[in-house]
Protein backbone atom coordinates (compact mmCIF):
# COMPACT_ATOMS: atom_id res chain seq x y z
CA UNK A 1 0.00 0.00 0.00
CA UNK A 2 1.16 3.50 -0.80
CA UNK A 3 0.33 6.81 0.88
CA UNK A 4 1.20 10.30 -0.29
CA UNK A 5 1.56 13.08 2.27
CA UNK A 6 1.22 16.55 0.77
CA UNK A 7 2.10 19.44 3.07
CA UNK A 8 4.47 22.39 2.81
CA UNK A 9 5.55 21.85 6.44
CA UNK A 10 8.34 19.30 6.76
CA UNK A 11 7.47 18.82 10.45
CA UNK A 12 3.85 18.04 9.59
CA UNK A 13 4.92 15.58 6.89
CA UNK A 14 7.14 13.80 9.42
CA UNK A 15 4.31 13.61 11.98
CA UNK A 16 1.94 12.14 9.40
CA UNK A 17 4.59 9.75 8.11
CA UNK A 18 5.16 8.41 11.63
CA UNK A 19 1.40 7.81 11.85
CA UNK A 20 0.87 5.95 8.58
CA UNK A 21 4.13 4.02 8.07
CA UNK A 22 3.38 1.54 10.91
CA UNK A 23 0.16 0.63 9.09
CA UNK A 24 2.27 -0.80 6.29
CA UNK A 25 2.21 2.14 3.91
CA UNK A 26 5.10 3.06 1.66
CA UNK A 27 5.13 6.85 2.12
CA UNK A 28 5.73 9.39 -0.63
CA UNK A 29 6.12 13.03 0.38
CA UNK A 30 5.28 16.17 -1.59
CA UNK A 31 5.66 19.84 -0.63
CA UNK A 32 2.65 21.19 -2.56
CA UNK A 33 0.00 20.17 -5.05
CA UNK A 34 2.19 20.59 -8.10
CA UNK A 35 4.93 18.48 -6.53
CA UNK A 36 2.32 15.84 -5.68
CA UNK A 37 1.01 15.68 -9.25
CA UNK A 38 4.53 15.23 -10.57
CA UNK A 39 5.03 12.27 -8.21
CA UNK A 40 1.73 10.52 -8.87
CA UNK A 41 2.10 7.50 -11.12
CA UNK A 42 -0.90 6.39 -13.15
CA UNK A 43 0.59 2.88 -13.46
CA UNK A 44 1.01 2.50 -9.69
CA UNK A 45 -1.34 4.97 -7.98
CA UNK A 46 -1.26 5.64 -4.27
CA UNK A 47 -4.00 4.23 -2.07
CA UNK A 48 -4.25 7.22 0.28
CA UNK A 49 -3.46 10.92 0.09
CA UNK A 50 -3.22 13.13 3.18
CA UNK A 51 -3.46 16.69 1.86
CA UNK A 52 -3.00 20.10 3.48
CA UNK A 53 -5.18 22.93 2.17
CA UNK A 54 -2.90 25.97 2.41
CA UNK A 55 0.26 25.44 0.37
CA UNK A 56 2.22 27.53 -2.11
CA UNK A 57 2.22 26.84 -5.87
CA UNK A 58 -0.93 24.66 -5.84
CA UNK A 59 -3.17 24.39 -2.81
CA UNK A 60 -4.83 21.24 -1.54
CA UNK A 61 -8.25 21.99 -2.96
CA UNK A 62 -6.85 22.43 -6.47
CA UNK A 63 -4.92 19.18 -6.02
CA UNK A 64 -8.05 17.28 -4.98
CA UNK A 65 -9.87 18.60 -8.05
CA UNK A 66 -7.05 17.46 -10.34
CA UNK A 67 -6.82 14.04 -8.68
CA UNK A 68 -10.56 13.48 -9.01
CA UNK A 69 -10.45 14.56 -12.67
CA UNK A 70 -7.96 11.78 -13.44
CA UNK A 71 -9.59 8.40 -13.98
CA UNK A 72 -6.50 6.49 -12.78
CA UNK A 73 -6.84 8.12 -9.35
CA UNK A 74 -10.61 7.69 -8.94
CA UNK A 75 -10.24 5.19 -6.09
CA UNK A 76 -7.58 7.06 -4.12
CA UNK A 77 -8.80 7.85 -0.59
CA UNK A 78 -8.18 11.57 -0.04
CA UNK A 79 -8.14 13.01 3.46
CA UNK A 80 -7.69 16.74 3.97
CA UNK A 81 -5.54 17.35 7.05
CA UNK A 82 -5.53 21.10 7.52
CA UNK A 83 -5.90 24.01 9.91
CA UNK A 84 -8.96 25.23 7.99
CA UNK A 85 -11.78 24.72 10.49
CA UNK A 86 -14.54 26.74 8.79
CA UNK A 87 -17.51 24.36 8.20
CA UNK A 88 -18.10 25.95 4.78
CA UNK A 89 -14.54 25.14 3.75
CA UNK A 90 -14.92 21.59 5.06
CA UNK A 91 -18.07 21.18 2.98
CA UNK A 92 -16.33 22.64 -0.06
CA UNK A 93 -13.44 20.17 0.25
CA UNK A 94 -15.85 17.26 0.47
CA UNK A 95 -17.84 18.58 -2.50
CA UNK A 96 -14.77 18.69 -4.75
CA UNK A 97 -13.85 15.13 -3.86
CA UNK A 98 -12.11 14.78 -0.51
CA UNK A 99 -13.28 11.65 1.31
CA UNK A 100 -12.57 12.90 4.83
CA UNK A 101 -11.42 16.01 6.64
CA UNK A 102 -9.38 16.46 9.83
CA UNK A 103 -8.54 19.78 11.46
CA UNK A 104 -4.98 20.32 12.74
CA UNK A 105 -3.52 19.80 15.15
CA UNK A 106 -3.97 16.05 14.80
CA UNK A 107 -1.99 13.32 16.43
CA UNK A 108 -0.79 10.05 15.01
CA UNK A 109 -3.41 8.01 16.85
CA UNK A 110 -6.20 10.08 15.28
CA UNK A 111 -4.82 9.57 11.76
CA UNK A 112 -4.30 5.84 12.31
CA UNK A 113 -7.80 5.48 13.73
CA UNK A 114 -9.36 7.24 10.74
CA UNK A 115 -7.43 5.12 8.24
CA UNK A 116 -8.22 1.88 10.07
CA UNK A 117 -11.90 2.85 10.29
CA UNK A 118 -11.98 3.63 6.58
CA UNK A 119 -10.27 0.35 5.77
CA UNK A 120 -12.73 -1.65 7.85
CA UNK A 121 -15.77 0.10 6.36
CA UNK A 122 -14.84 0.11 2.69
CA UNK A 123 -12.09 -2.42 2.16
CA UNK A 124 -10.35 0.19 -0.02
CA UNK A 125 -7.16 0.12 2.03
CA UNK A 126 -7.14 -3.57 2.91
Q: Could you describe each region identified by the protein language model?
A:
Residues 106-115:
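C-terminal output helix
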Residues 116-126:
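The C-terminal output helix
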Residues 29-48:
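Acidic, metal-coordinating helix/loop segments flanking the phosphotransfer/catalytic sites
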Residues 14-22:
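Charged docking surfaces used in two-component/phosphorelay signaling
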Residues 55:
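Receiver (REC) domain active-site loop signature in two-component systems and cognate sites
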Residues 52, 82:
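Active-site residues of response regulator receiver
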Amino acid sequence: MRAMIVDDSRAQRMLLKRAVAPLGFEVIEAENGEDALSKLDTDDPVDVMLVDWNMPVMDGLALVRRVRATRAFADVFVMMVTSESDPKKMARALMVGADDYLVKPVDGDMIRSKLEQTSAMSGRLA
